[in-house]
């Protein structure tokens, strides 16, 4: 009877060894050799301590920092709750949240049009980027709170605008964590 099960047993053990051990270890080794920063989560360090990842947004509050997109992933961009809100365009809850966020943003900068990404969450709820327009929209508030010149702050935002991937995929974006770290490093 064992002779009948032997080929199936050998096949399942070989498949398990290949797909469960050899392939994952090989890909991990290759990633560590070719892309060590990305393979380890694209971590950002300050004074030798990890302060975040280039790939996951953080909740910045207060007038002295640029704010990211609203997060549908719970408080503080909780990666364990990553996902969209699943609220449809006719959802009263979504409409109320967007109206509240819009009114708060409009009060902050009444002369400017509120960029959509400041009032809408991303699909994952963890997006670390905003559009350059969303960053520029926040310049007057941050400049006033930090006592900075708006022109200098706009120049800082300009330096943190990232081009689309490969020059043509997507739109220009600004990483909020990197921008806020540069803001702190500027000493204002």
From Swiss-Prot:
Keywords per UniProt: ATP-binding, Cell inner membrane, Cell membrane, Ion transport, Membrane, Nucleotide-binding, Potassium, Potassium transport, Transmembrane, Transmembrane helix, Transport
Keyword Cell wall biogenesis/degradation set for record: no
Chief location category: membrane
Ranges annotated as spanning the membrane: 7-27
Top-level lineage group: Bacteria
Matching Pfam families: KdpC (PF02669)
Subcellular compartments: Cell inner membrane
Topology within the bilayer: Single-pass membrane protein
GO molecular function: ATP binding; P-type potassium transmembrane transporter activity
GO CC terms of this entry: plasma membrane
Coiled coil region boundaries: none
NCBIfam families: kdpC, PRK00315.1
Family: Belongs to the KdpC family.
Stated role: Part of the high-affinity ATP-driven potassium transport (or Kdp) system, which catalyzes the hydrolysis of ATP coupled with the electrogenic transport of potassium into the cytoplasm. This subunit acts as a catalytic chaperone that increases the ATP-binding affinity of the ATP-hydrolyzing subunit KdpB by the formation of a transient KdpB/KdpC/ATP ternary complex.
Oligomer and partners: The system is composed of three essential subunits: KdpA, KdpB and KdpC.
Descriptive protein name: Potassium-transporting ATPase KdpC subunit
Organism listed in the record: Agrobacterium fabrum (strain C58 / ATCC 33970) (Agrobacterium tumefaciens (strain C58))
């Amino acid at each position: 009877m064992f002779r009948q099960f032997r080929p199936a047993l050998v096949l399942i053990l070989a498949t398990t060894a290949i797909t469960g051990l050899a392939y994952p270890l090989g890909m991990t080794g290759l990633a560590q050799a070719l892309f060590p920063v990305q393979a380890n989560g694209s971590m950002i360090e300050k004074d030798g301590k990890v302060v975040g990842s280039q790939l996951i947004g953080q909740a910045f509050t207060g007038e002295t920092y640029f704010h990211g997109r609203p997060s549908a992933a719970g408080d503080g961009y909780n990666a364990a709750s990553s996902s969209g809100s699943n609220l449809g365009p006719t959802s009263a809850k979504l409409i109320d949240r967007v109206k509240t966020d819009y009114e708060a943003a409009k009060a902050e900068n009444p002369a400017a049009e509120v960029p959509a990404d400041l009032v809408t969450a991303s699909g994952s709820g963890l997006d670390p980027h905003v559009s350059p327009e969303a960053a520029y929209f926040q310049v007057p508030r941050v400049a006033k709170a930090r006592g900075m010149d708006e022109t200098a702050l706009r120049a800082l935002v300009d330096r943190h605008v990232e081009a689309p991937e490969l020059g043509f995929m997507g739109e220009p974006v600004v990483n909020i964590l990197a921008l806020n770290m540069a803001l702190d490093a500027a000493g204002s």
